[in-house]
UniProtKB/Swiss-Prot annotation:
GO terms for molecular function: rRNA (pseudouridine-N3-)-methyltransferase activity. It comes from the Bacteria. Specifically methylates the pseudouridine at position 1915 (m3Psi1915) in 23S rRNA. Keywords: Cytoplasm, Methyltransferase, rRNA processing, S-adenosyl-L-methionine, Transferase. It is found in: Cytoplasm. This is Ribosomal RNA large subunit methyltransferase H. It comes from Pseudomonas putida (strain ATCC 47054 / DSM 6125 / CFBP 8728 / NCIMB 11950 / KT2440). HAMAP family: 23SrRNA_methyltr_H (MF_00658). It is an enzyme of class 2 (transferase). Signal peptide: none annotated.
Amino acid sequence: MRLRLIAVGSRMPKWVEEGWHEYAKRLPAELSLELVEIPLNTRGKNADVARLIRQEGEAMLSKVQPGERIVTLEVHGKPWSTEQLATELDRWRLDARTVNLMVGGPEGLAPEVCARAEQRWSLSPLTLPHPLVRILIGEQIYRAWTVLSGHPYHK
């Protein structure tokens, strides 16, 4: 199974890269967790933010192949417990399609990305910093896998 986090923003601090890679490497070979970074467009004082979001959305969708699943991470998405995420992870595994987890930039996701989503997931009603979201997603995917495999990490 292939999971990809497609996220707007690059040049993250080293601790973010280390945290992400720590959880990605803990997963078994049959569960690949990849990160695809989409460069954040420069936002000047007079920037057309709607156009920038649309461009970022186009770049995100260009990384998705036909037939792949899109799951958006949105404040107004559905909150999942660890056990519910494990259930979703198992469904995705049985579905045998690549799953693309989409995280937008500071202003969120382009409407075109949201329109293509098969599922909408909310990590929290709080606004979370994007570097932390990457690590949180990696850790929660790892934790969900440990639930499915009976590993003692999740007690």
